[in-house]
């Protein structure tokens, strides 16, 4: 798979357990049952979900749910992951967890594309950023380029913005 997509809105099956949420996707991969279980075990471990594997998704915190969603997005081992508003609706501790997961994906050689309005959270983990206004890219560059741009400050960030 070339790209996997994680929508802004929750995509977990709330009445299924954490493991079942992975399993339902794994069943469509063509892997043997043994390989499916092994892949689920790896994802549970990698995303700190092992202790929650029997918990229903309905009872997960925002950060736990987001980790499960990212784990599901990686089941087919994509080259890129598109994260739509990954920092929406999660607490500050979970933001740090998600930032760590994004860094880990990058370290694994998985490209991460993020669309998000939470500028501070996003700019601290990205290599390159694009500022769009009314559907048009008006500025691109490193996070420092964006933060220090008068244009970015006037059309989006505001004069008092800092990382």
Please place each PLM-identified region on the residue numbering.
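Conserved ABC ATPase "signature" region
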Residues: 23, 34-52, 100-103, 151
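Conserved ABC ATPase signature
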Residues: 56-60, 64
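Conserved catalytic motifs of ABC-family nucleotide-binding domains
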Residues: 77
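Hydrophobic anchor residue at the start of the ABC signature
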Residues: 70
